[in-house]
Amino acid sequence: MSEYRFETLQLHVGQEQADPATDARAVPIYQTTSYVFHNSKHAADRFGLADAGNIYGRLTNSTQDVLEKRLAALEGGSAALALASGAAAITYTIQALAANGGHIVAQKTIYGGSYNLLAHTLPQYGINTTFVDAHNLAELEGAIKEDTRAIYLETLGNPNSDIPDVDAIAEIAHKHGLPLVVDNTFGTPYLFRPFEHGADIVVHSATKFIGGHGTTLGGIIVESGKFDRKASGKYPNIAAPNPSYHGISFYDAVGPAAFVTFIRAILLRDTGATISPFSAFLLLQGVETLSLRLERHAENTKKVVDFLSKHPKVEKVNHPALADHPDHALYQKYFPNGGASIFTFNIKGGQEEAWKFIDNLSIFSLLANVADVKSLVIHPASTTHSQLNDEELADQGIGRNTIRLSIGTEHIDDIIADLEKGFAAI
């Protein structure tokens, strides 16, 4: 279906015809743990990857399969894997790339959970990370070592929506024979497609814009199918014969789907962060309206940024749409249709004023999620980024007076009136 446009692909890929078993037009929920093989040879072929198809519910499911095909198509990738959460998608990606004590170079202004994973959890398993200012290309390239296995970025940093120059960083990664991993959760394939700018692997917390309604946890890994893992010799778990899977080389067996197939067949098999069929179904409902929602998110965000930038009780608005933002040129280059509906602003005062503002909002919900159709708010320094010390907070551009907003799809006049209520309380 590659000839179709995004808005059509988000509705049809993976189920181009009615369901063959039931003639259902909607994607059915295949609520089963296992699948009957036609005969013994059929079973052996499935387990040997000679025949693509369902083996066991921990690895694959027909509802999940539609979600994977659809996200691969929307991102322009060769294959995808859906998982139980975005955290699982990121963890499996790093583990697959940096097994046996590898090293990662990562943008320092990333989601607090990803920062903790890379800075504190994975080092206990021999995987270490150097965090860099992604705007300083010399610093980024200088952090690459002999055992570096990937460069990791977010298209829009969390929580300040700062933007790395993906084209330039992809060039550095490939110069050193490394894949570029991009978390496109906030960008979404509707607004930005990392593979078109040199990325090799894309991850998502599908919980956010993909699902869009705050109902369902999920994660996605998509690969471009273009990175040659055999040539570099740095990824033997994918390119060399794998002793835990009949000596198969995933690279030789499935080529452009080798990366996600390795994760499915080995890491998911052994550690089981499986997405449920019902969760896959709910995420598919979100995918079908992705473009429509993102247009409204972007439209509302533009008006809220304009409102906040002129408000006397606001010290600073951290949004790349503003001409004085250091990433404004990159925003215009990579996000011509708008975006960055998750961003921060600094209120005049400190934590007390920030809390008072938040506690007097009505439409905005105080919770840890983002990218919902409902508008959301939180105080990062005391919640999502509370594990960071003051130096780490400052490195990520977060102060005690910083407030994160996630702009929803409500009527813009109601959103702005609610923000005014918060300001009136301080």
Where are these regions (language model features)?
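Conserved PLP-enzyme active-site core in the AAT-like
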Residues: 2, 10, 14-18, 79-310
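PLP-dependent enzyme catalytic core of the Aspartate aminotransferase-like
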Residues: 78, 119, 128, 146, ...
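Conserved N-terminal alpha-helix of the aminotransferase class I/II PLP-enzyme fold
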Residues: 39-91, 113-120
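Active-site beta-loop-alpha junctions enriched in small/polar residues
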Residues: 156, 185-187, 322, 348, ...
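Well-ordered beta-strand positions enriched in small/hydrophobic/aromatic, beta-favoring residues
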Residues: 151, 219-221, 317, 343, ...
